[in-house]
């Protein structure tokens, strides 16, 4: 069983709500294969580092999200101070961090060090959970800005590497740097140096977000998306009148990077599964069906963010003035680490999971990990998984 937690900045708090309900309803359930992309890497790393059953782990995850504030993610200052610091270095000797990205994220590193690390920078507890057999692999997805490749960093037992022209994997001992890199929203947060290269958000070029879990041997994948599935009527509704504001354009770009790929990959997996069902085993070329369940918000998280737009301060207030207003400020929903918004998303996630209890229970039935020999046959290299 694999768990995929996709990106979306502050939207990832929605996943914490879903997981909290799963922990309460299925406390003995475990996900041996964890994959995190973008802010989903924080949630995946939390599950991979903390001991206890699913209920205990998810309760601590929710507590961590409820504690977070904008000042725990990026340097919080007035919009005027931010503009001055971004445009002009205060001294010749000052590091040029603020020119590498709009926001400086050293507070997030400090926060993650307190929550996930043993003080050395390594993710505490992962080795113990691997040794106990509770965990098979933890994977964190990043983008190598130097090569343009999607790089998946994996800590696990006897994991075979994969390599394609545009996506590769490396076996390693995961650290806070890997989590920071995966969550580094392009242009907004600075890239993170790992070795000789700089890495950013794992969703930038990730055309097949389900692929890492499949490579790692998952025969079932539960994916928690942060994208609301609009109805046709909602999709046809104009978001603004006149020329599109910068916020609308930027939001669409962010959605295309972090939210749209999972839907396309899920559709491709469904088609491949249907095709394999029609073929005898000897003609499947080593491929096998992979069961998939995607859970997603019942409401538009961007529209929820609009309720808080008038209350933001610091850099977000300046961004709001520059970007203009829209009915669904998706860009804001990714940066709005305010307690009220985070709490609301956790509540929505919990309620959504509870209302889909029967569907989830049916999917989780008989969720046993396949033998390793079979897991190696699970590489799904058809269309959509060979980018």
Where are the model-predicted features located?
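Catalytic nucleophile serine of serine hydrolases
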Residues: 38
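Patatin-like phospholipase
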Residues: 1-35, 45-387
